[in-house]
Amino acid sequence: MLLDAGPQFPALGVGTFARHHHHHHHHHAAVAAAAAAAAEMQERELSLAQNTFVEPTHMAAFKLNPGGGSGGGSGGGGGGGGAGPNGGAGASGPHDLSPPGQTSAFTSQAGYPTSALAPHSAYSGAAAFNSPRDFLFRGRGFAEGSAAAGGGQHGLFGPPAGSLHHHPHHHHQLSHAEHPQGHLLFPGIHDQHAAASQNTLGGQMRLGLPGEVFGRTEQYRQVSSPRGDPYTAAQLHNQYSPMNMGMNMAAHHHHHHHHHPGAFFRYMRQPCIKQELICKWIDPEQLNNPKKSCTKTFSTMHELVTHVSVEHVGGPEQSNHICFWEECPREGKPFKAKYKLVNHIRVHTGEKPFPCPFPGCGKVFARSENLKIHKRTHTGEKPFQCEFEGCDRRFANSSDRKKHMHVHTSDKPYLCKMCDKSYTHPSSLRKHMKVHESSPQGSESSPAASSGYESSTPPGLVSPNSETQNPNLSPAAAAVSAVHNVSSGASGALASNFNEWYV
């Protein structure tokens, strides 16, 4: 009786398990093996065929050999026997997965010799796979003996040493014998160094999971994920801005670079660029003139902050809380408390020890109060309500509420220094200042020309005697030239940088 299990599992690409052998002395053994395999497939493998984790594209790479081992009995012995109709080797050949007298269960659909699907041919006889479940999910069968294969750690993902290249009589089975690597079942996984081969495929294989890496080796399990803690990542990136905390997302695809971790390279952090942080604190007891700063260098922000706090700021015995950092704009003006001095020094050192804990934000702050206010942008909290009766406006901080209160009163404390206009909110004043910046010709009648406002044409490009030098100058051009002369003469008395006036 012939049993054909192929129609039961079309997604697996499963063909018939066995055929009636032409040799009479193999008939009973073949029928018994086929019956056992069919029963096992019917009972255990029906769920595998419907499993969503096993993609047909992966399973189509394997099929059962309908008659691959027919030459094992008659021509077997020594050289490997005769080949079957589909190119399967004989039972005694070096590429047979089955023991003598049993039909070879699997062959590669692309014409691979069966030894390419196992670590080495010596183990193939002991690892007979009678069902796709045994073949696909027996991780042990692919891991044991990998060291003896000469570094070929995964036959499923690339041709291991001794599987394709040292059997020239099977190269005719490959559709592209010149480039056997073109037939890699999983070309994204490259061959790795032989030292890592003993840790390969130690557990169950998973097929068809996007993003999963097959054959994950032990030495890369401790590599941190690129999706690290945003709290720590933001703190490191902003505290040490010159440092390269990015990750190399380009995988190396050279087949000859065996020392690279291959697919794991994109998850490895690059070494940080070393930087030097210099202490510019000036000792007030120095007798030198000009006084020299400390100039000690540190490799981390923590070391610099500790040095300044211990060596220069001092402990509670210090009564004067003065910043002596080089070129400090306070010019020796003391603080009322030590914590205020510590917060001020962060302006010089660049320390920002308070990162936003919300994922994806990445902002860091030098003061905890600023972080508290910033977190309200994520939570939507607005605890400051307008105190004017009938107004329901709420704000995240008190300063915004104070600016809003001028809308309800007649106060307009934000004055324009170019004209006599005033505004209730600084944003309105900033919009107004753009009018002065963008209207150079209107400056003839505006106070901007006489108060030192610089027009769009640089005064240096206009000659002071342009009226007398060019008698053909039109009256309008002469008026514009006169405006430029007045503007250039008074520019030293009044600054023109509006950003310095209004913050």
From Swiss-Prot:
Tissues expressing the protein: Expressed in both animal and vegetal regions of the oocyte. At blastula and gastrula stages (stages 9 to 10.5), expressed throughout the ectoderm. During late gastrula to neurula stages, expression gradually diminishes in the midline region of the neural plate and increases in the anterior neural folds, and continues to be expressed in the posterior medial part of the neural plate. In early tailbud stages (stages 22-23), expressed in the dorsal forebrain, midbrain and hindbrain. Subsequently expressed in the telencephalon and diencephalon/mesencephalon boundary.
GO CC annotation, single: nucleus
Any single GO BP term: regulation of transcription by RNA polymerase II
Key words of the record: Activator, Cytoplasm, Developmental protein, Differentiation, DNA-binding, Gastrulation, Metal-binding, Neurogenesis, Nucleus, Repeat, Repressor, Transcription, Transcription regulation, Zinc, Zinc-finger
Secretion signal, residue range per the UniProt entry: none
Region of interest (Disordered), ranges: 61-112, 146-175, 427-476
UniProt biased composition (Gly residues): 66-91
Zinc finger (C2H2-type): 277-312, 321-348, 354-378, 384-408, 414-436
Biased composition (Basic residues): 164-174
One Pfam family of this chain: zf-C2H2
Biased amino acid composition, Polar residues: 100-112, 463-473
Biased composition annotated in UniProt, kind: Low complexity: 438-456
Domain notes from UniProt: The C2H2-type 3, 4 and 5 zinc finger domains are necessary for transcription activation.
Role of this protein: Transcriptional repressor that inhibits neurogenesis and induces neural and neural crest differentiation. Regulates anteroposterior patterning in early development by inhibiting expression of the nodal genes through the inhibition of vegt. Required for gastrulation movements and for proper anterior neural and axial development. May also act as a transcriptional activator. May bind to the minimal GLI-consensus sequence 5'-TGGGTGGTC-3'.
PANTHER family hit by this protein: GLIS FAMILY ZINC FINGER 2, TRANSCRIPTIONAL ACTIVATOR CUBITUS INTERRUPTUS
Protein known as: Zinc finger protein ZIC 2-A
Lineage, opening ranks: Eukaryota, Metazoa, Chordata, Craniata, Vertebrata
Gene name tied to this protein: zic2-a
